[in-house]
């Protein structure tokens, strides 16, 4: 939703913090055993929902991110925008006006209080729900969406505690409904090209990946009463770890077939001092301003290392505070070579275009000509026209709708969502325990060993 009152944030964040304290007291180091919970339903790996001639969509939250999804859905065929819900009238009016302007029927509106979304969920003419709300609402809304018989599509991150992750997994298995965390970066042109190259063996056997969310967002602290900064800022006062791991980690996980033949085993994490936000507040706000009364505890830079069961390593970084250029790293090293992003560059020992692997090949066009992903070949021009983070948003939503209308499994499932998001919690636990390792829960309950690998992904 566009806005959440501060008291609701503080209540939710306080509960999260209390849960973390308990977890940190009881957690051990690498010996920390995370036994799978009893299963209450069939695994949803490869879940295929009955084909939908038309995908009927409801939106919970149509503020900044949610409105972007509304815009993109208006460009898609085979969808009906049935209803929207938000607590902020201005963004409701904007969304309705845009939908009508696109010559689509006016959606039903639900508003009034924080629980108005339940009226939307009570309808029987909605197939999927797009959830774009502050983080603390993601888990309860996703669970209630599936309980209401609908498929849940949730903004990142999926959840804020290990228990929430398990509750969502359990609900998906019991209801046999999809719960996809909408990790849009997996649908970027470069990321999908690398996936294509990996599946064709260009880099050899995979050894190591590097992922990040490096995005200077101090300016969001000036969003006091509404917009993302009005609630996101407070997380820097409540947790110390990787607050936002999935943008970089999602693509690297799919390159490595995490939860489809390999899985995360354990993590170790450490944070730098937390200095930048307090300095920014002192510089940009009056001394008595609310932003100067907060105690910022989240380290400006968090670095985590993940070990997989097959022995691969992944470095994951988070930094939304320091003055530096944007990066997600997107580095993948194999036995035959390496791809690195920001800027994009490649070095391979065999199968390249004549350059030595001792120097970077930064001429990407010839690599696109040979390995551009089938999805981008098919709808890349539409994606570039419709935009959304360079087109990745459009490709993601197009692919979601395609799978639902054609009876195909989604590219990301609830186990991916839980595994990528839980880095938030586990990094916090490790930081608070002198960077000792913390074991990942196996949300698949062992099914990862026999799950079919993710293919090149096409349409």
Curated annotation (Swiss-Prot):
Pfam families: GFO_IDH_MocA, Glyco_hydro_109_C, TAT_signal. Substrate binds at residues 213, 232, 244-247, 326. PROSITE patterns: TAT. Predicted to be exported by the Tat system. The position of the signal peptide cleavage has not been experimentally proven. Binds 1 NAD(+) per subunit. The NAD(+) cannot dissociate. GO terms for molecular function: hydrolase activity, acting on glycosyl bonds; nucleotide binding. Its cofactor is NAD(+). It comes from the Bacteria. It is an enzyme of class 3 (hydrolase). Its EC number is 3.2.1.-. Residues 1-31 form the signal peptide. Keywords: Glycosidase, Hydrolase, NAD, Signal. NAD(+) binds at residues 64-65, 86, 135-138, 155-156, 184, 244. Belongs to the Gfo/Idh/MocA family. Glycosyl hydrolase 109 subfamily. Glycosidase. This is Glycosyl hydrolase family 109 protein. It comes from Shewanella putrefaciens (strain CN-32 / ATCC BAA-453). The lineage of its organism: Bacteria, Pseudomonadati, Pseudomonadota, Gammaproteobacteria, Alteromonadales.
